[in-house]
Amino acid sequence: MFINRWLFSTNHKDIGTLYLLFGAWAGMVGTALSILIRAELGQPGALLGDDQIYNVIVTAHAFVMIFFMVMPMMIGGFGNWLVPLMIGAPDMAFPRMNNMSFWLLPPSFLLLLASSMVEAGAGTGWTVYPPLAGNLAHAGASVDLTIFSLHLAGVSSILGAINFITTIINMKPPAMTQYQTPLFVWSVLITAVLLLLSLPVLAAGITMLLTDRNLNTTFFDPAGGGDPILYQHLFWFFGHPEVYILILPGFGIISHVVTYYSGKKEPFGYMGMVWAMMSIGFLGFIVWAHHMFTVGLDVDTRAYFTSATMIIAIPTGVKVFSWLATLHGGNIKWSPAMLWALGFIFLFTVGGLTGIVLSNSSLDIVLHDTYYVVAHFHYVLSMGAVFAIMAGFVHWFPLFSGFTLDDTWAKAHFAIMFVGVNMTFFPQHFLGLSGMPRRYSDYPDAYTTWNTVSSMGSFISLTAVLIMIFMIWEAFASKREVMSVSYASTNLEWLHGCPPPYHTFEEPTYVKVK
C-alpha cells in the first residue's frame, strides 16, 4: 500500500530515500535562489530593485541549503541508508521516531517559504541578529515564521540525533566494538552528538528572540537591560558546531570512497581518523566567538579564540594526509566518485587555508563581512559538503537503486560542476580582499569584472545541475543492473545485493573476531 509504505514508513531504507529526494528537491530551490543572487550581482545597478527582497533571497538560500539540502541528504539520507547496513542492524533503534524526524521537515520548509510570502519577508541573513530581526526593523510575521521553521527543523535533527546515537551504540553485534565500526558510522555518531548539544542552545536563543518580538521581553534590548551580543553568543555556540555537523558526515563518505577506489581494504590511520573527528567535534564547541571578532571582545579573548581556532587545523590536517596516504600505492580506479573525492580533498583544503587566514583576529577585522568570508565558506560547503554528497551519491547509487549511472555522463557532470563552482567562488577572494562587503545587492563599478566572472560561473554550475537530473533519468530509463561489487567483504553495506532486500539482518548478526 503506497500510503503505508511512504507516509507511515518505519523502514530505514525508505526513510533514507525520502530524505534523499527531499534534499535533492530542496537543493533545486536553493540553487534557484543562488542564481537569483548571482543574477542581481552580475552587473552594477539594480535587477530586483529592492534591497529587502534581495536579503530575503540570501537568507532563504542559506536556510534552504543548510537545513533542507545538506543535512537531510548527509545525515538523513546517507545516514539512514548506510548506518544500519554497516553495523549489521535490522533497522534504526526508533523506527517511528525516524519517520517523524523526516516528516517534520516539509512543514518546516513550508513555514520558511511562508515567511517570504507574508509582509516583507525575513531579510535578516541566516544569523537572524537582533535588532535587525526585532519587531521594529522587521515588523510583521516573517521573522516569527522563520523562527518556527527553525524550531521544527531543530526538533527533527535532535530526534534524528537521539536515534543515531542509540542505534550506533546499542545495535551493533555483541562482538563488535565501537572501534570496529566503519568511519562513516563514526562520523554520523559524532555529528549526532554535536547536534544534540548545540541545537538546544539555538532553540533557547531564537525563543528569546521570539519573546522579545512578541511578549515585550528585553533579552536582546539594551533599553530593558538586555544585550544583542548575548544573542550572538547563543547563536554562534550553535552556529559553529553546525558547520562541523555539515562537513563531518562528508569526511566519513570521503574516507569510504577514497578507500574503495584505491583498492585498499581499510583507510590509512583508522584510529587517527576517529581521533581527528572526535577532536574536531570537541574543538568545534570552543571557538564560536571567532565569528564575533568585530563586536568589541577583550584582546585576551580574541587571542584565545584565534589560537583555539587554529588548533582545529591539526586534526583536519591529519584527515587530509590520511586520505592522501590511503591513495598512496593503491590500484586507483578513476571512477566518477573518485573524481568527486579528489576534488573534495583539494578544494576543501583550499577552503581550510582561507579559514586559517580568517582565524587571525587582527586580519578578520578587515575581512569580516566581506566576500572573502563568503568565498571561504562556499569553498568548504559548495565544494566540500556538496562534493562529498556527490561522491557518496554516485558511489552508492547502485546500492540505493539497483541501477548504474553512465560513466561518461557522470564524469562530464563532475568536470562542468568543477569548473562552475571554482569560477563562481575563486574570484570572490579578490572581491573580499578589495573590500567588497557581503549582503549588498549593488556595488561600486570597480568590482564589476570579478562579479561578472562569478555570475558566469554560477550559470555553468546550473548547467551541471541540469546534466545531473538528465544523468539520473538516463540511469532509470536504461535500467543497467549491477553485475558485481568489488571488495564486498570489507564493505558490509554491499553484502545483500543491489538494491538490498526490504528487510536486512532479520536474524541477529554474528561477527567472527580473529
Curated annotation (Swiss-Prot):
UniProt-annotated binding residues for Fe(II)-heme a: H61, H378
Chain positions recorded as heme a3 binding sites: H376
Mitochondrial matrix-facing ranges: 1-14, 81-93, 167-185, 256-271, 325-337, 394-408, 474-514
Catalysed conversion reaction: 4 Fe(II)-[cytochrome c] + O2 + 8 H(+)(in) = 4 Fe(III)-[cytochrome c] + 2 H2O + 4 H(+)(out)
Residues at which Cu cation binds: H240, H290, H291
Keyword annotations from UniProtKB, A to Z: Calcium, Copper, Electron transport, Heme, Iron, Magnesium, Membrane, Metal-binding, Mitochondrion, Mitochondrion inner membrane, Respiratory chain, Sodium, Translocase, Transmembrane, Transmembrane helix, Transport
Co-factor: note: Binds 2 heme A groups non-covalently per subunit.
Protein name: Cytochrome c oxidase subunit 1
Provenance organism: Mus musculus (Mouse)
Gene from which the chain derives: Mtco1
